[in-house]
Protein backbone atom coordinates (compact mmCIF):
# COMPACT_ATOMS: atom_id res chain seq x y z
CA UNK A 1 0.00 0.00 0.00
CA UNK A 2 1.49 3.42 -0.93
CA UNK A 3 2.37 5.68 1.98
CA UNK A 4 0.01 8.64 2.05
CA UNK A 5 1.40 11.90 3.38
CA UNK A 6 -0.68 15.03 3.36
CA UNK A 7 -0.14 18.28 5.24
CA UNK A 8 -3.19 19.92 6.79
CA UNK A 9 -3.83 22.84 9.13
CA UNK A 10 -6.94 21.71 11.00
CA UNK A 11 -9.50 18.94 11.36
CA UNK A 12 -13.12 19.97 10.96
CA UNK A 13 -15.89 17.93 12.54
CA UNK A 14 -19.28 18.47 10.93
CA UNK A 15 -22.49 16.70 9.95
CA UNK A 16 -22.10 14.10 7.21
CA UNK A 17 -24.72 13.74 4.49
CA UNK A 18 -26.07 10.25 3.62
CA UNK A 19 -24.25 10.51 0.29
CA UNK A 20 -20.95 11.27 2.07
CA UNK A 21 -21.39 8.26 4.42
CA UNK A 22 -22.03 5.96 1.42
CA UNK A 23 -19.01 7.50 -0.33
CA UNK A 24 -16.80 6.57 2.68
CA UNK A 25 -17.66 2.88 2.42
CA UNK A 26 -18.65 2.22 -1.19
CA UNK A 27 -16.19 0.87 -3.78
CA UNK A 28 -16.68 -0.45 -7.31
CA UNK A 29 -14.80 -3.63 -8.20
CA UNK A 30 -13.24 -4.11 -11.68
CA UNK A 31 -16.11 -6.45 -12.61
CA UNK A 32 -18.55 -3.58 -11.98
CA UNK A 33 -19.86 -4.95 -8.68
CA UNK A 34 -20.49 -2.26 -6.04
CA UNK A 35 -19.50 -3.30 -2.50
CA UNK A 36 -19.60 -1.56 0.85
CA UNK A 37 -23.04 -2.27 2.28
CA UNK A 38 -23.07 -4.57 5.32
CA UNK A 39 -26.27 -6.63 5.13
CA UNK A 40 -25.61 -9.61 7.41
CA UNK A 41 -25.08 -9.63 11.20
CA UNK A 42 -22.61 -12.56 11.06
CA UNK A 43 -18.97 -11.98 11.93
CA UNK A 44 -16.89 -15.13 11.26
CA UNK A 45 -17.78 -18.69 10.25
CA UNK A 46 -17.50 -20.97 13.28
CA UNK A 47 -16.12 -23.86 11.18
CA UNK A 48 -13.63 -22.16 8.87
CA UNK A 49 -12.98 -19.16 11.20
CA UNK A 50 -13.04 -16.98 8.07
CA UNK A 51 -15.10 -13.77 7.84
CA UNK A 52 -18.64 -14.17 6.46
CA UNK A 53 -19.33 -12.41 3.17
CA UNK A 54 -21.42 -9.18 3.49
CA UNK A 55 -21.06 -9.52 7.28
CA UNK A 56 -19.37 -7.26 9.81
CA UNK A 57 -15.90 -8.60 8.95
CA UNK A 58 -16.46 -9.16 5.20
CA UNK A 59 -13.20 -9.33 3.24
CA UNK A 60 -14.86 -8.08 0.05
CA UNK A 61 -15.91 -4.84 1.78
CA UNK A 62 -13.01 -4.25 4.18
CA UNK A 63 -10.07 -6.05 2.55
CA UNK A 64 -8.28 -9.39 3.08
CA UNK A 65 -7.75 -10.80 6.59
CA UNK A 66 -4.28 -12.06 5.56
CA UNK A 67 -1.68 -10.13 3.56
CA UNK A 68 -1.82 -10.76 -0.21
CA UNK A 69 -4.42 -13.54 0.06
CA UNK A 70 -8.02 -13.58 -1.16
CA UNK A 71 -10.93 -15.20 0.71
CA UNK A 72 -11.15 -18.39 -1.36
CA UNK A 73 -7.37 -18.89 -1.56
CA UNK A 74 -7.12 -18.70 -5.36
CA UNK A 75 -4.62 -15.84 -5.19
CA UNK A 76 -1.74 -15.85 -2.71
CA UNK A 77 1.59 -13.97 -2.58
CA UNK A 78 2.52 -10.38 -3.26
CA UNK A 79 2.93 -10.91 -7.03
CA UNK A 80 -0.88 -10.78 -7.40
CA UNK A 81 -1.00 -7.29 -5.86
CA UNK A 82 -4.08 -5.27 -6.91
CA UNK A 83 -5.93 -8.21 -8.53
CA UNK A 84 -9.57 -8.66 -7.53
CA UNK A 85 -10.45 -12.36 -7.29
CA UNK A 86 -13.19 -13.18 -9.81
CA UNK A 87 -14.46 -15.99 -7.58
CA UNK A 88 -14.80 -14.26 -4.17
CA UNK A 89 -14.44 -10.57 -5.14
CA UNK A 90 -11.67 -9.85 -2.61
CA UNK A 91 -8.85 -7.49 -3.62
CA UNK A 92 -5.35 -8.93 -3.12
CA UNK A 93 -3.62 -6.34 -0.94
CA UNK A 94 -2.19 -5.82 2.54
CA UNK A 95 -4.40 -6.69 5.49
CA UNK A 96 -3.76 -3.31 7.10
CA UNK A 97 -6.35 -1.76 4.77
CA UNK A 98 -8.84 -3.27 7.24
CA UNK A 99 -7.80 -0.49 9.62
CA UNK A 100 -9.20 2.29 7.45
CA UNK A 101 -11.73 0.84 4.96
CA UNK A 102 -15.27 1.52 6.10
CA UNK A 103 -18.65 0.04 5.29
CA UNK A 104 -22.22 1.26 5.74
CA UNK A 105 -25.69 0.02 6.70
CA UNK A 106 -28.63 1.32 4.68
CA UNK A 107 -31.54 1.70 7.11
CA UNK A 108 -35.05 0.54 6.19
CA UNK A 109 -36.43 3.56 8.09
CA UNK A 110 -34.82 6.86 9.13
CA UNK A 111 -33.63 7.22 12.75
CA UNK A 112 -32.61 10.35 14.67
CA UNK A 113 -29.05 10.90 15.84
CA UNK A 114 -29.18 10.70 19.64
CA UNK A 115 -26.48 13.39 20.10
CA UNK A 116 -28.63 16.01 18.39
CA UNK A 117 -31.84 14.85 20.06
CA UNK A 118 -30.69 14.25 23.64
CA UNK A 119 -27.60 16.46 23.79
CA UNK A 120 -27.56 19.59 25.94
CA UNK A 121 -28.80 21.72 24.34
CA UNK A 122 -30.98 19.64 21.99
CA UNK A 123 -30.24 21.11 18.54
CA UNK A 124 -33.18 19.26 17.04
CA UNK A 125 -35.62 20.81 19.52
CA UNK A 126 -34.05 24.28 19.08
CA UNK A 127 -34.26 24.12 15.27
CA UNK A 128 -37.85 22.86 15.28
CA UNK A 129 -38.77 25.39 17.99
CA UNK A 130 -40.51 22.63 19.93
CA UNK A 131 -40.08 21.37 23.50
CA UNK A 132 -37.65 18.44 23.75
CA UNK A 133 -40.34 16.29 25.39
CA UNK A 134 -42.62 16.75 22.35
CA UNK A 135 -39.82 15.84 19.90
CA UNK A 136 -39.08 12.69 21.94
CA UNK A 137 -42.77 11.74 21.92
CA UNK A 138 -42.74 11.89 18.11
CA UNK A 139 -39.40 10.07 17.65
CA UNK A 140 -40.31 7.16 19.94
CA UNK A 141 -43.80 6.66 18.42
CA UNK A 142 -45.87 7.98 21.34
CA UNK A 143 -47.46 10.93 19.53
CA UNK A 144 -48.32 11.99 15.99
CA UNK A 145 -47.37 15.41 14.64
CA UNK A 146 -49.27 17.52 12.10
CA UNK A 147 -47.08 18.02 9.01
CA UNK A 148 -49.75 19.88 7.04
CA UNK A 149 -53.08 20.94 8.62
CA UNK A 150 -54.71 21.25 5.15
CA UNK A 151 -58.16 22.82 5.49
CA UNK A 152 -58.94 21.26 8.90
CA UNK A 153 -60.09 24.08 11.22
CA UNK A 154 -58.93 22.39 14.45
CA UNK A 155 -55.35 21.55 13.40
CA UNK A 156 -52.15 23.62 13.39
CA UNK A 157 -48.63 22.99 12.02
CA UNK A 158 -46.44 20.92 14.42
CA UNK A 159 -49.41 20.17 16.69
CA UNK A 160 -49.11 16.89 18.62
CA UNK A 161 -51.93 14.34 18.41
CA UNK A 162 -52.59 11.22 20.45
CA UNK A 163 -53.53 7.88 18.83
CA UNK A 164 -57.25 8.45 19.56
CA UNK A 165 -57.24 12.02 18.21
CA UNK A 166 -55.59 10.87 14.96
CA UNK A 167 -58.10 8.02 14.55
CA UNK A 168 -61.00 10.48 14.92
CA UNK A 169 -59.47 12.79 12.28
CA UNK A 170 -58.76 9.79 10.01
CA UNK A 171 -62.40 8.69 10.21
CA UNK A 172 -63.43 12.24 9.42
CA UNK A 173 -61.12 12.36 6.36
CA UNK A 174 -62.35 9.04 4.91
CA UNK A 175 -66.07 9.79 5.32
CA UNK A 176 -67.87 10.02 1.96
CA UNK A 177 -69.17 13.52 2.61
CA UNK A 178 -65.81 14.77 3.97
CA UNK A 179 -64.52 18.09 2.67
CA UNK A 180 -61.12 17.80 4.41
CA UNK A 181 -58.16 18.00 2.04
CA UNK A 182 -54.37 18.10 2.36
CA UNK A 183 -54.19 16.91 5.99
CA UNK A 184 -50.82 15.22 6.60
CA UNK A 185 -49.78 13.63 9.88
CA UNK A 186 -46.55 11.75 10.66
CA UNK A 187 -44.84 9.85 13.45
CA UNK A 188 -41.30 8.71 14.23
CA UNK A 189 -38.01 9.94 12.79
CA UNK A 190 -39.60 10.21 9.30
CA UNK A 191 -41.88 12.98 10.60
CA UNK A 192 -38.94 14.80 12.21
CA UNK A 193 -36.98 14.46 8.95
CA UNK A 194 -39.87 16.00 7.03
CA UNK A 195 -40.17 18.91 9.52
CA UNK A 196 -36.43 19.58 9.30
CA UNK A 197 -36.48 19.36 5.50
CA UNK A 198 -39.30 21.91 5.36
CA UNK A 199 -37.20 24.48 7.24
CA UNK A 200 -36.00 27.43 5.14
CA UNK A 201 -32.93 28.39 7.17
CA UNK A 202 -32.28 31.75 5.51
CA UNK A 203 -35.91 32.88 5.87
CA UNK A 204 -35.98 31.67 9.50
CA UNK A 205 -32.76 33.58 10.27
CA UNK A 206 -34.12 36.82 8.75
CA UNK A 207 -37.38 36.47 10.67
CA UNK A 208 -35.54 35.76 13.95
CA UNK A 209 -33.39 38.88 13.53
CA UNK A 210 -36.55 40.97 13.24
CA UNK A 211 -38.12 39.32 16.29
CA UNK A 212 -34.95 39.81 18.38
CA UNK A 213 -35.12 43.58 17.81
CA UNK A 214 -38.62 43.72 19.30
CA UNK A 215 -38.19 41.31 22.22
CA UNK A 216 -36.34 41.27 25.54
CA UNK A 217 -35.56 39.10 28.54
CA UNK A 218 -35.95 35.34 28.44
CA UNK A 219 -37.69 35.35 25.05
CA UNK A 220 -34.84 37.34 23.47
CA UNK A 221 -32.23 34.90 24.90
CA UNK A 222 -34.18 31.95 23.45
CA UNK A 223 -34.40 33.61 20.02
CA UNK A 224 -30.66 34.41 20.02
CA UNK A 225 -29.85 30.78 20.89
CA UNK A 226 -31.99 29.55 17.97
CA UNK A 227 -30.50 32.11 15.58
CA UNK A 228 -26.97 31.06 16.56
CA UNK A 229 -27.73 27.41 15.71
CA UNK A 230 -29.35 28.35 12.38
CA UNK A 231 -26.40 30.62 11.47
CA UNK A 232 -23.99 27.76 12.18
CA UNK A 233 -25.95 25.45 9.87
CA UNK A 234 -25.90 28.10 7.12
CA UNK A 235 -22.15 28.76 7.61
CA UNK A 236 -21.14 25.08 7.46
CA UNK A 237 -23.48 24.23 4.59
CA UNK A 238 -24.98 21.33 6.59
CA UNK A 239 -28.65 20.52 6.13
CA UNK A 240 -30.84 20.05 9.23
CA UNK A 241 -32.33 16.79 7.89
CA UNK A 242 -28.85 15.20 8.09
CA UNK A 243 -29.44 14.96 11.86
CA UNK A 244 -31.82 12.14 10.93
CA UNK A 245 -29.82 9.14 9.73
CA UNK A 246 -30.78 7.00 6.74
CA UNK A 247 -27.31 5.43 6.44
CA UNK A 248 -25.00 4.39 9.27
CA UNK A 249 -21.22 4.13 8.78
CA UNK A 250 -19.56 0.89 9.91
CA UNK A 251 -16.09 1.52 11.29
CA UNK A 252 -13.17 -0.63 10.00
CA UNK A 253 -13.07 -4.17 11.45
CA UNK A 254 -9.54 -3.90 12.86
CA UNK A 255 -10.76 -1.06 15.09
CA UNK A 256 -13.40 -3.41 16.63
CA UNK A 257 -11.44 -6.69 16.52
CA UNK A 258 -12.46 -10.26 17.32
CA UNK A 259 -9.61 -12.37 18.74
CA UNK A 260 -9.47 -16.07 19.56
CA UNK A 261 -8.57 -16.96 23.15
CA UNK A 262 -6.62 -20.03 24.32
CA UNK A 263 -9.70 -22.14 25.08
CA UNK A 264 -11.08 -21.71 21.57
CA UNK A 265 -13.51 -18.99 22.66
CA UNK A 266 -13.59 -15.54 21.10
CA UNK A 267 -13.27 -12.10 22.67
CA UNK A 268 -14.88 -9.34 20.67
CA UNK A 269 -15.36 -5.60 20.84
CA UNK A 270 -18.71 -4.42 22.21
CA UNK A 271 -19.28 -2.48 18.98
CA UNK A 272 -19.78 -5.76 17.10
CA UNK A 273 -22.71 -6.67 19.39
CA UNK A 274 -24.22 -3.20 18.96
CA UNK A 275 -23.82 -3.31 15.15
CA UNK A 276 -25.32 -6.83 15.12
CA UNK A 277 -28.44 -5.59 16.95
CA UNK A 278 -28.85 -2.77 14.42
CA UNK A 279 -28.47 -5.11 11.39
CA UNK A 280 -30.84 -7.74 12.84
CA UNK A 281 -33.56 -5.19 13.55
CA UNK A 282 -33.01 -3.42 10.22
CA UNK A 283 -33.31 -6.69 8.25
CA UNK A 284 -36.42 -7.68 10.23
CA UNK A 285 -38.02 -4.27 9.54
CA UNK A 286 -37.24 -4.55 5.81
CA UNK A 287 -38.83 -8.01 5.75
CA UNK A 288 -41.97 -6.77 7.57
CA UNK A 289 -42.32 -3.88 5.12
CA UNK A 290 -41.99 -6.31 2.19
CA UNK A 291 -44.80 -8.56 3.42
CA UNK A 292 -46.98 -5.50 4.22
CA UNK A 293 -47.22 -6.33 7.93
CA UNK A 294 -49.74 -4.42 10.12
CA UNK A 295 -48.75 -0.83 10.89
CA UNK A 296 -48.51 -1.43 14.66
CA UNK A 297 -45.91 -4.21 14.17
CA UNK A 298 -43.88 -2.14 11.69
CA UNK A 299 -44.01 0.84 14.04
CA UNK A 300 -42.77 -1.24 16.96
CA UNK A 301 -39.87 -2.54 14.84
CA UNK A 302 -38.99 1.03 13.80
CA UNK A 303 -38.91 2.06 17.47
CA UNK A 304 -36.64 -0.90 18.27
CA UNK A 305 -34.34 0.08 15.36
CA UNK A 306 -34.21 3.64 16.73
CA UNK A 307 -33.22 2.30 20.17
CA UNK A 308 -30.56 0.00 18.63
CA UNK A 309 -28.97 2.93 16.76
CA UNK A 310 -29.14 5.07 19.93
CA UNK A 311 -27.28 2.33 21.84
CA UNK A 312 -24.65 2.08 19.08
CA UNK A 313 -23.96 5.82 19.05
CA UNK A 314 -24.31 6.53 22.79
CA UNK A 315 -25.36 3.63 25.01
CA UNK A 316 -27.30 4.77 28.06
CA UNK A 317 -27.99 8.33 26.84
CA UNK A 318 -31.68 7.50 26.61
CA UNK A 319 -33.73 4.58 27.87
CA UNK A 320 -32.32 1.33 29.20
CA UNK A 321 -28.58 0.72 28.90
CA UNK A 322 -27.76 -2.28 26.70
CA UNK A 323 -25.69 -4.75 28.74
CA UNK A 324 -23.57 -7.74 27.77
CA UNK A 325 -22.25 -10.64 29.83
CA UNK A 326 -22.06 -10.08 33.62
CA UNK A 327 -24.51 -7.17 33.25
CA UNK A 328 -21.71 -4.92 32.03
CA UNK A 329 -22.86 -1.96 29.90
CA UNK A 330 -21.60 -2.25 26.31
CA UNK A 331 -19.11 0.43 25.18
CA UNK A 332 -20.66 2.50 22.41
CA UNK A 333 -18.93 4.82 19.92
CA UNK A 334 -19.32 7.77 22.32
CA UNK A 335 -17.78 5.84 25.21
CA UNK A 336 -14.75 5.04 23.03
CA UNK A 337 -14.02 8.67 22.19
CA UNK A 338 -15.10 10.51 25.36
CA UNK A 339 -13.45 10.96 28.74
CA UNK A 340 -9.95 10.60 30.10
CA UNK A 341 -9.46 7.11 28.66
CA UNK A 342 -11.11 8.05 25.34
CA UNK A 343 -9.50 8.25 21.93
CA UNK A 344 -8.88 12.01 22.02
CA UNK A 345 -7.40 12.46 25.49
CA UNK A 346 -5.65 9.10 25.78
CA UNK A 347 -4.34 8.46 22.28
CA UNK A 348 -4.25 11.79 20.44
CA UNK A 349 -3.63 14.50 23.04
CA UNK A 350 -1.91 12.15 25.48
CA UNK A 351 0.70 10.76 23.12
CA UNK A 352 4.22 10.12 24.37
CA UNK A 353 6.53 12.65 22.76
CA UNK A 354 10.28 12.76 22.31
CA UNK A 355 12.45 15.30 24.17
CA UNK A 356 10.19 15.19 27.21
CA UNK A 357 10.41 13.91 30.77
CA UNK A 358 8.27 13.68 33.87
CA UNK A 359 9.02 13.82 37.58
CA UNK A 360 7.70 14.82 41.00
CA UNK A 361 7.96 18.52 41.89
CA UNK A 362 9.52 19.88 45.08
CA UNK A 363 9.86 23.46 46.27
CA UNK A 364 12.97 25.37 45.18
CA UNK A 365 13.22 28.31 47.64
CA UNK A 366 16.61 29.50 46.31
CA UNK A 367 15.43 29.71 42.69
CA UNK A 368 14.52 32.91 40.93
CA UNK A 369 11.03 33.09 39.48
CA UNK A 370 12.12 32.36 35.90
CA UNK A 371 14.19 29.32 36.93
CA UNK A 372 13.46 25.67 37.63
CA UNK A 373 15.66 22.95 39.04
CA UNK A 374 16.21 20.15 36.51
CA UNK A 375 17.69 16.85 37.76
CA UNK A 376 21.05 16.08 36.11
CA UNK A 377 19.88 12.58 35.16
CA UNK A 378 16.89 14.03 33.29
CA UNK A 379 18.80 16.94 31.74
CA UNK A 380 21.52 14.75 30.17
CA UNK A 381 18.81 12.58 28.59
CA UNK A 382 16.73 15.52 27.30
CA UNK A 383 19.65 17.55 25.95
CA UNK A 384 21.67 14.55 24.70
CA UNK A 385 21.67 15.53 20.97
CA UNK A 386 22.83 19.07 21.87
CA UNK A 387 25.55 17.69 24.17
CA UNK A 388 26.76 15.23 21.50
CA UNK A 389 26.83 18.01 18.89
CA UNK A 390 28.89 20.26 21.18
CA UNK A 391 31.30 17.42 22.13
CA UNK A 392 32.01 16.78 18.43
CA UNK A 393 32.26 20.52 17.64
CA UNK A 394 34.76 21.06 20.47
CA UNK A 395 36.68 18.00 19.16
CA UNK A 396 36.44 16.22 22.52
CA UNK A 397 35.19 13.17 20.59
CA UNK A 398 35.19 12.29 16.88
CA UNK A 399 31.80 10.63 16.40
CA UNK A 400 28.34 10.10 17.91
CA UNK A 401 29.13 6.59 19.18
CA UNK A 402 32.12 7.82 21.18
CA UNK A 403 30.04 10.70 22.58
CA UNK A 404 27.29 8.31 23.71
CA UNK A 405 29.86 6.07 25.41
CA UNK A 406 31.25 9.10 27.19
CA UNK A 407 27.76 10.02 28.44
CA UNK A 408 27.11 6.47 29.65
CA UNK A 409 30.41 6.53 31.61
CA UNK A 410 29.32 9.76 33.36
CA UNK A 411 32.58 11.42 32.34
CA UNK A 412 33.10 14.66 34.39
CA UNK A 413 33.60 16.65 31.15
CA UNK A 414 29.98 15.89 30.23
CA UNK A 415 28.59 18.04 33.06
CA UNK A 416 30.62 21.09 31.99
CA UNK A 417 29.35 20.71 28.41
CA UNK A 418 25.78 20.21 29.67
CA UNK A 419 26.03 23.43 31.72
CA UNK A 420 27.08 25.28 28.54
CA UNK A 421 24.23 23.71 26.53
CA UNK A 422 21.41 24.52 28.95
CA UNK A 423 22.59 28.09 29.54
CA UNK A 424 20.04 30.25 27.77
CA UNK A 425 18.04 27.24 26.55
CA UNK A 426 14.58 27.43 28.19
CA UNK A 427 12.47 24.36 28.93
CA UNK A 428 8.68 24.13 29.13
CA UNK A 429 6.99 22.82 32.27
CA UNK A 430 3.42 21.52 32.05
CA UNK A 431 1.12 20.30 34.80
CA UNK A 432 -1.98 18.32 33.85
CA UNK A 433 -4.78 19.20 33.59
CA UNK A 434 -3.82 22.18 31.41
CA UNK A 435 -7.00 24.19 31.99
CA UNK A 436 -5.67 27.57 30.79
CA UNK A 437 -2.65 28.85 28.93
CA UNK A 438 -0.62 29.34 32.12
CA UNK A 439 -0.68 25.56 32.59
CA UNK A 440 2.45 25.51 30.39
CA UNK A 441 5.25 27.98 31.14
CA UNK A 442 8.92 28.36 30.22
CA UNK A 443 11.81 28.34 32.71
CA UNK A 444 15.59 28.52 32.58
CA UNK A 445 16.88 25.16 33.84
CA UNK A 446 19.36 24.95 36.71
CA UNK A 447 21.06 21.57 37.19
CA UNK A 448 20.25 20.04 40.59
CA UNK A 449 21.07 16.81 42.38
CA UNK A 450 18.35 14.24 43.07
CA UNK A 451 15.51 13.11 40.83
CA UNK A 452 12.83 15.76 41.53
CA UNK A 453 12.07 18.91 39.53
CA UNK A 454 12.43 22.05 41.66
CA UNK A 455 9.75 24.70 41.15
CA UNK A 456 9.56 28.28 42.42
CA UNK A 457 6.66 28.50 44.91
CA UNK A 458 5.29 31.72 43.36
CA UNK A 459 4.29 30.03 40.10
CA UNK A 460 2.24 27.34 41.88
CA UNK A 461 -1.16 29.15 41.66
CA UNK A 462 -0.85 29.37 37.83
CA UNK A 463 -0.25 25.61 37.60
CA UNK A 464 -2.66 24.89 40.50
CA UNK A 465 0.24 22.86 41.90
CA UNK A 466 1.28 21.95 45.41
CA UNK A 467 4.10 19.83 46.70
CA UNK A 468 2.18 16.82 48.04
CA UNK A 469 3.32 14.49 45.25
CA UNK A 470 2.26 16.42 42.12
CA UNK A 471 4.09 15.51 38.92
CA UNK A 472 5.03 17.77 36.03
CA UNK A 473 6.20 17.17 32.48
CA UNK A 474 9.28 18.84 30.94
CA UNK A 475 9.51 19.59 27.20
CA UNK A 476 12.52 20.94 25.31
CA UNK A 477 11.82 23.52 22.56
CA UNK A 478 14.17 22.47 19.75
CA UNK A 479 14.16 25.11 17.02
CA UNK A 480 15.49 28.65 17.47
CA UNK A 481 11.96 29.99 16.81
CA UNK A 482 10.48 27.79 19.53
CA UNK A 483 13.19 28.84 21.99
CA UNK A 484 12.63 32.53 21.19
CA UNK A 485 8.88 32.15 21.61
CA UNK A 486 9.35 30.35 24.93
CA UNK A 487 11.67 33.11 26.17
CA UNK A 488 9.58 36.06 24.96
CA UNK A 489 6.04 34.84 25.58
CA UNK A 490 6.09 31.91 27.95
CA UNK A 491 8.75 32.75 30.54
CA UNK A 492 7.18 32.60 34.01
CA UNK A 493 8.38 36.11 34.90
CA UNK A 494 6.44 37.48 31.87
CA UNK A 495 3.17 35.90 33.00
CA UNK A 496 2.36 37.72 36.22
CA UNK A 497 -1.25 38.65 35.34
CA UNK A 498 -4.02 36.14 34.69
CA UNK A 499 -5.18 36.31 31.03
CA UNK A 500 -8.73 35.54 32.20
CA UNK A 501 -9.22 38.25 34.84
CA UNK A 502 -6.28 40.63 34.46
CA UNK A 503 -5.52 40.23 38.17
CA UNK A 504 -2.12 39.04 39.44
CA UNK A 505 -1.83 35.26 39.43
CA UNK A 506 1.71 35.34 40.87
CA UNK A 507 0.79 35.85 44.51
CA UNK A 508 2.58 34.64 47.65
CA UNK A 509 0.77 31.82 49.40
CA UNK A 510 1.19 29.10 52.00
CA UNK A 511 4.83 28.89 53.22
CA UNK A 512 5.74 32.38 51.98
CA UNK A 513 2.85 34.12 53.75
CA UNK A 514 3.48 32.06 56.88
CA UNK A 515 7.21 32.92 56.78
CA UNK A 516 6.53 36.64 56.36
CA UNK A 517 4.03 36.54 59.22
CA UNK A 518 6.42 34.63 61.48
CA UNK A 519 9.30 37.04 60.81
CA UNK A 520 7.25 40.16 61.53
CA UNK A 521 5.05 38.84 64.36
CA UNK A 522 5.19 40.10 67.97
CA UNK A 523 5.47 37.88 71.04
CA UNK A 524 4.33 39.79 74.18
CA UNK A 525 5.09 36.77 76.40
CA UNK A 526 8.86 37.13 75.87
CA UNK A 527 11.03 38.70 78.60
CA UNK A 528 11.51 42.47 78.23
CA UNK A 529 14.52 43.37 76.07
CA UNK A 530 13.49 47.02 75.62
CA UNK A 531 16.44 48.25 77.68
CA UNK A 532 18.85 47.06 74.96
CA UNK A 533 20.16 49.59 72.46
CA UNK A 534 22.08 48.69 69.28
CA UNK A 535 24.18 50.89 67.04
CA UNK A 536 22.91 49.46 63.73
CA UNK A 537 20.85 46.69 62.09
CA UNK A 538 23.87 44.43 61.63
CA UNK A 539 24.51 44.35 65.40
CA UNK A 540 20.90 43.22 66.02
CA UNK A 541 21.12 40.44 63.41
CA UNK A 542 24.51 39.35 64.85
CA UNK A 543 23.06 39.24 68.39
CA UNK A 544 20.15 37.11 67.11
CA UNK A 545 22.46 34.74 65.21
CA UNK A 546 24.64 34.31 68.32
CA UNK A 547 21.60 33.43 70.41
CA UNK A 548 21.60 36.58 72.60
CA UNK A 549 18.22 37.73 71.24
CA UNK A 550 14.97 35.91 70.34
CA UNK A 551 13.56 36.58 66.85
CA UNK A 552 10.50 38.40 68.20
CA UNK A 553 12.13 40.46 70.98
CA UNK A 554 11.61 44.26 70.88
CA UNK A 555 14.88 46.24 71.00
CA UNK A 556 15.99 49.80 70.24
CA UNK A 557 18.25 50.22 67.22
CA UNK A 558 19.83 53.40 65.89
CA UNK A 559 18.47 54.57 62.51
CA UNK A 560 19.19 58.05 61.18
CA UNK A 561 16.93 57.86 58.13
CA UNK A 562 13.40 59.23 57.83
CA UNK A 563 10.68 57.26 59.62
CA UNK A 564 7.04 57.38 58.55
CA UNK A 565 5.21 55.56 61.33
CA UNK A 566 1.99 57.56 61.11
CA UNK A 567 2.26 58.52 64.80
CA UNK A 568 0.60 61.95 65.29
CA UNK A 569 0.46 61.81 69.10
CA UNK A 570 2.40 64.28 71.25
CA UNK A 571 5.77 62.87 72.36
CA UNK A 572 6.94 62.71 75.95
CA UNK A 573 9.74 65.31 76.21
CA UNK A 574 12.69 65.18 78.62
CA UNK A 575 14.94 68.31 78.72
CA UNK A 576 18.56 68.09 79.92
CA UNK A 577 20.82 70.72 81.57
CA UNK A 578 22.71 71.43 78.34
CA UNK A 579 19.45 72.29 76.59
CA UNK A 580 19.24 69.05 74.60
CA UNK A 581 15.93 67.17 74.54
CA UNK A 582 14.73 63.56 74.27
CA UNK A 583 11.44 63.08 72.38
CA UNK A 584 9.86 59.72 73.18
CA UNK A 585 7.21 58.41 70.77
CA UNK A 586 5.59 54.95 70.96
CA UNK A 587 7.97 53.41 68.39
CA UNK A 588 10.95 55.80 68.22
CA UNK A 589 13.15 58.00 70.41
CA UNK A 590 14.73 61.14 68.97
CA UNK A 591 17.50 63.18 70.69
CA UNK A 592 17.87 66.86 69.65
CA UNK A 593 20.44 69.50 70.59
CA UNK A 594 19.58 72.94 72.02
CA UNK A 595 19.00 74.26 68.48
CA UNK A 596 16.49 71.51 67.61
CA UNK A 597 18.93 69.66 65.34
CA UNK A 598 18.61 65.87 65.49
CA UNK A 599 21.57 64.13 67.11
CA UNK A 600 20.36 60.53 66.96
CA UNK A 601 17.22 58.44 66.46
CA UNK A 602 16.39 54.99 67.77
CA UNK A 603 13.46 52.91 66.50
CA UNK A 604 11.70 50.06 68.30
CA UNK A 605 11.71 46.85 66.22
CA UNK A 606 12.50 43.12 66.29
CA UNK A 607 15.34 41.08 64.71
CA UNK A 608 12.72 39.32 62.55
CA UNK A 609 11.47 42.60 61.06
CA UNK A 610 15.04 43.74 60.37
CA UNK A 611 15.80 40.47 58.52
CA UNK A 612 12.52 40.79 56.55
CA UNK A 613 13.27 44.41 55.60
CA UNK A 614 16.87 43.66 54.56
CA UNK A 615 15.70 40.78 52.35
CA UNK A 616 13.13 43.03 50.62
CA UNK A 617 15.72 45.81 50.11
CA UNK A 618 18.27 43.38 48.64
CA UNK A 619 15.65 41.95 46.26
CA UNK A 620 14.63 45.44 45.09
CA UNK A 621 18.24 46.51 44.65
CA UNK A 622 19.07 43.47 42.50
Swiss-Prot record:
The UniProt entry's coiled-coil ranges are none
Alphabetized GO MF terms: DNA binding; DNA-directed RNA polymerase activity; magnesium ion binding; zinc ion binding
Describe cofactor binding as the record notes it.
Binds 1 Mg(2+) ion per subunit.
Required co-factor(s) are: Mg(2+); Zn(2+)
Q: Which residues bind Zn(2+)?
A: 70, 72, 85, 88
InterPro entries annotated for this entry? DNA-dir_RpoC1_gamma, DNA-dir_RpoC_beta_prime, RNA_pol_asu, RNA_pol_N, RNA_pol_Rpb1_1, RNA_pol_Rpb1_3, RNA_pol_Rpb1_3_sf, RNA_pol_Rpb1_clamp_domain
Q: What is its EC number?
A: 2.7.7.6
Q: Kindly state which keywords UniProt assigns to this record, in alphabetical order.
A: DNA-directed RNA polymerase, Magnesium, Metal-binding, Nucleotidyltransferase, Transcription, Transferase, Zinc
- Fetch the HAMAP family from UniProt: RNApol_bact_RpoC1
The name under which this protein is listed is: DNA-directed RNA polymerase subunit gamma
- Name the source organism: Thermosynechococcus vestitus (strain NIES-2133 / IAM M-273 / BP-1)
